[in-house]
Amino acid sequence: MVSVSEIRKAQRAEGPATILAIGTANPANCVEQSTYPDFYFRITNSEHKTELKQKFQRMCDKSMINRRYMYLTEEILKENPSVCEYMAPSLDARQDMVVVEVPRLGKEAAVKAIKEWGQPKSKITHLIFCTTSGVDMPGADYQLTKLLGLRPYVKRYMMYQQGCFAGGTVLRLAKDLAENNKGARVLVVCSEVTAVTFRGPSDTHLDSLVGQALFGDGAAALIVGSDPIPEIEKPIFEMVWTAQTIAPDSEGAIDGHLREAGLTFHLLKDVPAIVSKNIDKALVEAFQPLGISDYNSIFWIAHPGGPAILDQVEQKLALKPEKMKATREVLSEYGNMSSACVLFILDEMRRKSIQNGLKTTGEGLEWGVLFGFGPGLTIETVVLHSVAI
């Protein structure tokens, strides 16, 4: 007779969860940040609000974003005037867009990740799908399973309405699945489309305008598994430790509410201060067991909620400017893509590390950290170990 402990041991992997492939995708429509205020105020019939437009222009200029990608084209917005009006009932129109586009964009990223992984999709055992863009039943996880032709008994996890910290959440969940299910190969997909949050400007709600200056569309996909098959699977990063915490005294700092007018976001001005105030504690908890206290000696992947958050974290920890290079590059080229952002940064970092002839996937360094920040205010922490190139 086999004991429970023997069964448990046989079910578990030996090594740490490892990222084995990364794929990303964006809509074809590219929006230049320098000309976006003109487009935005024209398409929302708000050109008469000249002072507000000047404020928005300053927001865009300070955003450190060069371009973003958006599913919403001028043609689509002209066909859906309720989406352009501030707080007009428009949820049906938005839902009709995102329930199709979110899994479609997710598929595009997933196909790239599966191709890089180099294994048949029949070997995928689990699927984690994450989006803050719309809600549906059966969910985007089901739609993606159909679009990719995955096996019907793939174990699916659908995460709706998590917000910007969720790039860390999917890694935490994927780590637990991979390490506790021997031979598991987890497809992780974050797909975000701003059709739920786009709306015209309001003089009385400038936090809504901040979102219009920052958010962009994108999808990222990973394959995660433990005990990579030698010569066949190529590890990129190992996930060593994860944590999630709610920052004290932060209630209401970041809120999102799904209403008839779509998804409304509310941000307090002190969000960057709350993040920078709590980041030291998160780092000590993560790196003290490794004997690391010099945070310039590790590589950095932080959700780029906006330039102010990155600036204050750098200042608080006395980080060298190059520490946030990959993070700022993704913010500059894509904007804030909510949950997908940190996965784009993982891809950017490993690509640049290879291009620059560095020793590891983590900018030549051994250890690194990935942070997600979002509603709550919730902080996700992932300790990463790089792989030799």
Swiss-Prot record:
Pathway participation: Secondary metabolite biosynthesis; flavonoid biosynthesis
Record has Membrane as a keyword: no
Record-level GO BP terms: flavonoid biosynthetic process; polyketide biosynthetic process
Matches recorded under CDD domains: CHS_like
Reactions that this protein is recorded to catalyse: (E)-4-coumaroyl-CoA + 3 malonyl-CoA + 3 H(+) = 2',4,4',6'-tetrahydroxychalcone + 3 CO2 + 4 CoA
Matching Gene3D superfamilies: 3.40.47.10
Signal peptide: none
Cited function: The primary product of this enzyme is 4,2',4',6'-tetrahydroxychalcone (also termed naringenin-chalcone or chalcone) which can under specific conditions spontaneously isomerize into naringenin.
Protein's name in the database: Chalcone synthase 5
Organism listed in the record: Pisum sativum
Name of the gene encoding the protein in the UniProt record: CHS5
